[in-house]
Amino acid sequence: MGAAKIWDATEVAEEAQENGISDIPSSSLAVDISLPLPRMKPQIIGLCKDLFKNWSQLDESCFLVETVSGGITNLLLKVSVREDNGPEVSLTVRLYGPNTEYVIDRPRELQAIKFLSAAGFGARLLGVFGNGMVQSFIDALTLSPSDMRKPKLASEIARQLRKFHQVQIPGSQEPQLWNDIFKFLEKASVLKFEDSEKQQKYDTISFEEVNNAVVELKDLTDLLNAPVVFAHNDLLSGNLMLNEDEEKLYFIDFEYGSYSYRGYDIGNHFNEYAGFDCDYSFYPDKDAQYHFFRHYLQPEKPQEVSDEDLEALYVEANSYMLASHLYWALWALIQAKMSPIDFDYLGYFFLRYGECKRRKEACFSLARSYLTRSGSG
């Protein structure tokens, strides 16, 4: 009975891709994300029983709940269900972190998941609830930052990203990057911290300087006329999964997805080569970037990409790479105030903003030289 219900739920999710998000099972229940897993487990089981009614009479012993990963903005759990001697069925429960609505547009995320899933990206949406969603389980391993840097995987990521950028999401296709950055800047510039040490660090920030940096970069990148695509915007190693047996790569977690600039999504991805330690010496050199670009621009004939197209994307990605640092720096300031997670968000602001300033001169020089030669500057 349990297995049949899960596959029914999957069919419901697929139908919802055509009929709208409201056709997906929903529950008003919420899960207390602050609880340790043993105390959280009864809430997770109760949620699954509420969403999938054919499980409502199952004993709790039929459910196994495990932690898959705990990101900065969400917690991912695997729920395995076995009824009697039937096959085991697995799904994932994603719990939103507290106050993440300040930096994530959840309705936009749910809208995108529906269509990205239909296009073959990510897990299928099986249900939604008060502070999270239930999705199909992906049998794959999360990549490490060093994995992303391997040429074979880099080329596959590039090919998949090209397909991702071709997905059409209904609604406005206006790029949201600068809207989001200016919203973050507005919120970040008026924060007050109860912790005096945090407040002292915060008070050293010149928001006039940050605002000028944002405006100057926007003015420069506007001249590039970069293509607008539906972008993932958070393509770090933790959001890439690989099933080696099937040689299948998965993009997951579309929390920050929006229409944006092609170069931003690529430049942001390159920043993530730095890994969790933020070692930006791992940022890809020109040869590694060109390898990625060839497989992104012409997956079938990567060696036939013109020098002109390679240079244009190189300038685009390395200009918007700076915008990625500004975005996540301001994001971190808001998280420093709103998030209960024990993470040095203020330190992360200074790290990302400092890297932006360090790279600015070289990137601006590259872009201006290109624009002058192309007659666009």
Give the positions of each predicted feature:
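Active-site activation/catalytic loop segments of kinase-like enzymes and analogous catalytic loops
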Residues: 263-305, 322-340
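Helical subdomain adjoining the active site within ATP-dependent kinase catalytic cores
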Residues: 305-377
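Catalytic activation segment of kinase domains across protein kinase-like and atypical kinase folds
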Residues: 238-275
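Catalytic-loop of the protein kinase fold
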Residues: 230-232, 237
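Eukaryotic beta-rich interaction modules
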Residues: 45-62, 71-74, 83, 213, ...
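ATP-binding pocket architecture of kinase catalytic cores
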Residues: 66-210, 216, 220-228, 245-246
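Juxta-kinase regulatory segment immediately upstream of eukaryotic protein kinase catalytic domains
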Residues: 2-66
